[in-house]
Curated annotation (Swiss-Prot):
Residues holding thiamine diphosphate: H79, A120, H121, S122, G152, A153, N180, Y289, E371
E.C. number: 2.2.1.7
Name of the protein in its database record: 1-deoxy-D-xylulose-5-phosphate synthase
Entry binding sites for Mg(2+): D151, N180
Gene from which this protein is expressed: dxs
Amino acid sequence: MSARPDTPLLDTVSYPEDLRKLEPGQLRQLSDELRAEMISAVGVTGGHLGSGLGVVELTAAIHYVFNTPEDRLIWDVGHQCYPHKILTGRRDRIRTLRQGGGLSGFTKRSESEYDPFGAAHSSTSISAGLGFAVANKLKGEPGKAIAVIGDGAMSAGMAYEAMNNAEQAGNRLIVILNDNDMSIAPPVGGLSGYLARLMSSSEYLGLRSLASRMTAKVSRRVHTSLGKAEEYTKGLVTGGTLFEELGFYYVGPIDGHNLDHLIPVLENVRDAEEGPFLIHVRTVKGKGYAPAENSADKYHGVAKFDVVTGEQKKSTGGPPAYQNVFGETLAKLADSDPRICAITAAMPSGTGVDKFAKAHPDRAFDVGIAEQHGVTFAAGLAAQGMRPFAAIYSTFLQRAYDQVVHDVAIQNLPVRFAIDRAGLVGADGSTHAGSFDVTYLATLPNFVVMAAADEAELVHMTYTAAEHDSGPIAFRYPRGGGIGIDLPETPEKLEIGKGRIVKHGSKVALLSLGTRLEEAKRAADELEAKGLSTTIADMRFAKPLDTELIAQLMKNHEVVVTIEEASIGGLGAHVLTYASDEGLTDAGLKIRTMRLPDAFIEQDAPEKQYDEAGLTAPHIVDTVLKALRQNSAGVEEARA
């Protein structure tokens, strides 16, 4: 492990109030030390490195100029918040990032007063900032709201919806566009930095206000024309016309690593009577750490790594990741089916669509952080005879639920949903858990909902979805590697709504949906050792249910337990509803449902999360024994 960096100036700063005691000329040294500390910490924990390295100077400048936490600083997504955490009283815990019981990898209201709004999903910061700004305005309280949003997050419509309503906040709202992808602005140089300071100065803003009042006395047509002339002239130099149209005073672009530019611009905007402002800041993702700057992904998300070399600690060889199994299977299917296409919302490698895109680039579509558009785009493709696969994380599909209902389900369009990161996901915690998709999809008419028990089942389900043209179909699978089962050379088309018996028994029936099947197998072994003959069924489908199989198991077993890595309202609820409707519980059958608890489970290793959720083999055994009123030794307990 590398030694911790020498940080004499940073050691004197625990909170922003300490930072504000420094001289402006000391901020360069502070930023260098802050960057070194962040690299050292993430080398130990893993996490999102590149984004935070790119905003070190910006973070220091914001806390130096603004009176946080009274001025509310809101980070969009939160990938870039590690330097912010170090400067706001959490440096002593920074090496617990994303660990069980440690600091969150995102901003979190319960963690610090300097985190006024939690984040992890994209493009929410401007709306939240507007809420803070307007609330302070209505209450007559001081305080600005500063929303820092990346250029990638600006691809989502929600950001523009917020900006379109932001004028009511006046000078209380400041949006900082952190542009690190060279996708919006021309190159930054001395002229643009000079213009930014000029256009944010009180003299310029005062002159602009005076000119506006004077031109208001001429005809409306002339007044409008003069305003447009100024706007477009400035836009030619800065690229800010769009933001001006939305009612913002646009400043920039400026070099986000040049403190001599950042500090005066932020001070000018802080003191301005006009507003709202959008400050366009250009940064370099991975700034100051050569391995990150030279990497294609700028070390966006990394495992633990050697700080000196940048070499990440590779996991030992094992089964292929589920997303890669999906991507490679879909690419093979598309070789012989020109109707198959794939859609991802800014997560090509995370969903495996990158594998598909290499083979079929003309049929792979990355729509950016725009899940709503992506789903309706897929619906349009399906309506025109294509076979679209919308590959979206479970937690992000929530963002497009209206489109799933209105544009897909109601029209019964055959959109295929490949739902990655189903269940609990480990270090990213509750904001990224795929807890709810079974519940929110299986309740919809026309939908077919599947869950893969292993990587071989995922191959079959991908093929089944490709061949299913009679309506929408979804299949879910978890993060990480499979169980090591051999992949089938030829995929099998599954019969819709039919499960499979994995093990035959006579007293206890375990109905598993998804990858908890392995825990069900371990539980069955333990139950058999206690003399309890156990059947295991891999249900495969949450909807439609295999009612024939369920009825058979309920009539021939004393205890039936459903097991799923999903929230209440999923398989268990549907099985109970069916059993009630058919009177299958009238004769005293014992039914128990095991699912994720009614709580948000925080970051930890997945196996610890599932233990906390009560979804491991010992929990299954305990549930069966309690249903039979037996103790852990399998001996029947006395009844009260």
